[in-house]
């Protein structure tokens, strides 16, 4: 399976090769349709045909991602009503219903601090690539009609691990058997992220709010916006330090204000 390269989000009935026509992040119109060109990982592409986003591998295989209209998103969330919100991070998670199905809607609201716009599209690309894994929150589709992409995911009945018990409720400690099950399943998902693709991809933001649980207590890893690929033949990559205080390695997180910090990764299999 190839990883992502030229992500071409094209709202038209015909897939066009925009690689020679656009710069990263450039938006323009042609024939009444809006186009967005975005460059990410190597050897693949994300395109849109007849309302369906497609991630293409170098072998020509496509992974369809459904596109939802802004009307569907606004109706599902009652115009992003806060009473529908079930979690807040760099984005807001809303519980909604689309076509009689409960869904989880991820909306990047406002200007996330120190957040590269590329991360929005990386989240779509990596989430789609990972959605076949049983321990990853399945991406159902997205909406490109807002200033930033809105992601639509499967709805995990028990919610985020960080909020088990709900606001104001007495939270009973999870049984050790459940904790070990969650740890193993997330480890399986991370191992898949590290080893399934031609380049190792590092999540960089593992925390309780990014782990969801379904009705069977099956763990689901989510939120790949901060993920980064390790160049072939390398053990690490230089990038701006990012993550969440309290969940990263202390020395690493203490350098959050550094312009760059060497991220060294060794994958254990």
Swiss-Prot record:
The gene is ZRK7. PANTHER family: PROTEIN KINASE SUPERFAMILY PROTEIN-RELATED, WALL-ASSOCIATED RECEPTOR KINASE-LIKE 21. Keywords: ATP-binding, Kinase, Nucleotide-binding, Transferase. This is Serine/threonine-protein kinase ZRK7. One of its GO terms (molecular function) is protein serine/threonine kinase activity. Residues 80-269 form the Protein kinase domain. The keyword Transmembrane does not apply. ATP binds at residues 86-94, 106.
């Amino acid at each position: 399976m190839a990883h992502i390269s030229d992500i071409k989000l094209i709202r038209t009935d015909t897939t066009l090769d925009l690689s020679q026509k656009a710069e990263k992040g450039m938006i323009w119109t042609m024939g009444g349709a809006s186009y967005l060109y975005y460059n990410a990982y190597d050897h693949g592409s994300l395109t849109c045909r007849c309302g369906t986003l497609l991630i293409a591998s170098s072998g020509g295989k496509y992974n369809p991602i459904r596109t939802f209209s802004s009307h569907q998103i606004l109706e599902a969330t009652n115009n992003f009503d806060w009473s529908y919100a079930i979690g807040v991070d760099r984005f807001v998670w809303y519980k909604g219903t689309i076509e009689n199905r409960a869904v989880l809607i991820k909306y990047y609201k406002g200007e996330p601090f120190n957040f590269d716009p590329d991360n929005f599209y990386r989240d779509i690309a990596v989430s789609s690539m990972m959605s076949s894994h049983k321990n990853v929150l399945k991406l159902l589709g997205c909406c490109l009609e807002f200033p930033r992409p809105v992601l639509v995911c499967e709805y995990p009945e028990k919610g985020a691990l960080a909020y088990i018990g709900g606001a104001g409720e007495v939270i009973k400690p999870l049984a050790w058997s459940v904790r070990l099950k969650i740890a193993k399943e997330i480890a399986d998902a991370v191992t898949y992220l590290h080893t399934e693709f031609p380049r190792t991809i590092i999540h960089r933001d593992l925390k309780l709010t990014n782990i969801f649980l379904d009705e069977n207590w099956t763990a689901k890893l989510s939120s790949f916006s901060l993920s980064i690929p390790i160049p072939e033949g390398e053990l690490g990559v230089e990038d701006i330090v990012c993550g969440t205080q309290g969940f990263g390695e202390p020395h690493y997180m203490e350098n959050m204000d550094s312009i760059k910090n060497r991220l060294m990764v060794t994958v254990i299999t």
